[in-house]
Every structure is written in C-alpha cells, then in structure tokens.
C-alpha cells in the first residue's frame, strides 16, 4: 500500500492534505464554517475533523508501519459500531477504493482546480457541454472516450481499446470493460456489507452511522455511474467503428444505468449536504451532485 511504497525513488514518505483543507478557499467561505452538512442531526458543531477519525487512524498507523496490527483500528470500529464493526470495515474497504480507481483510470486533469471526481462534472461521450473546460488539460478529442488515464502504460484510452478490439489485437493493457467490472465489484461489495451493517448496528439512526451510511452509498453510486459510463463509452466507440446498431443500443442502455446511479446519489445527498459545497470558484470547485 501507500506506506510500503512511500519511499520508492528515495521519497521521504507521503504528504496528505486534511480532507477539508480547501473548504471555503478563494473567498468561498459561507456562514456555518466548514461543516458540509445541511441536516442539523448530522452537523458536527465546529469539530468537522471528527468525521475523519477513522481515516486519520488508518493513514497514521499504516504510513508509519505498513504491517501494523489491525487491532489498532478495529477496536475503534467496535467502540463506534459494536457488532457491526466488521461489516463497516468491509464496506469502507470497498467503497474507499472507488475514488482512487476513478482518479487513476480517468485522468482528466492533474489540477485540483480542474478535476473533482467526487462531484464529477460530466465529460460527454460525444463532444458537447464543458468541452472547452476539459480541453485545457486533456489531449483531444475532449470526450470521455478520448481521455487518457494517469497511467497509460497500464490502461487503454477507450478509443484506442476500441481500435484494437475491432482489429482483433491487444497489447496487454486493461480495457474499459475490465475497469467497469472493477467498479461494479467494488459497488456490489460496499452495498452488501453496508446492508449487513444496518442489521447489526445498535441504532441505525445514530448520526455517526448515518454519516458513514450516506458516504458509502455515494461512493458505491459513483462506482456504478462510472461502470455504466465506461461500458457506454466503449459500446459507442465500437458503434462508430463498425456501424453495428447493437452497440449503439448497448451504449444507450449502459448510459441509462449510469444516469440512474447518479440520480440515486442526488436522492441520497440532497436532503443532507449543503446545496453548494465550496472548495473554489471554478466549474469544478463548488457545487452539489
């Protein structure tokens, strides 16, 4: 993991930004401080860092010692969630892999001012809205299928993968269908273990559990959105190359699944998060799902 590889190339370790480092930057602060919640029951009373106690514990322990005893974080989970501790750990373990996977396979920009995968500004499969925003830091064409990963030696661009599929060749890199499968597996695992946690936790309405439940649901939804988007992008790219309408129908169906996943995120977050989460001034610096 990060701790074990943090000294690769003579690096001195890993530098972390506290999760709300940029909240309210560039003059975008608002009444209520850094608390992201609109729901009074979930607000943290000026102690927003408490939401991330488990995050800090994992990073601190495992950056210092990649072989740390799991008991050092599991006792915290037992204290917080009782009999649901193991299910919570498993749900978070799957859900927390979704955003790092999105970030590496869908490399829209290396700038945090231009790319916010948590609250994604949709990059169209066909050139359309926001094209100029993406064009600044993305090789053309500024479409979802034309976007590179941050590790192009490991992952195909969708357009390049479609070219190779049609030509009947492969070069060993991971394609869009494989990536979509990973997103689906992570979402399935997170949702399964979260459902188990709901049945085991003493009080499912407890704010500590509700905050976790909402965020795991959102991350699983992001996994399903990007799974559908990758499958839609690949099917559409194959349609353009073959003119086989079956691929076009497949693209539409996959995109409908992606849209449904995104709508599910909106349904979950709209009542609980503030309407405008401000981390900056640009298109990808503030907003809501």
What would you call each of these model-derived segments?
Residues 18-286:
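C-terminal non-catalytic alpha-helical accessory regions
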Residues 1-13, 257:
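Catalytic-core region of carbohydrate-active enzymes that cleave or remodel glycosidic bonds
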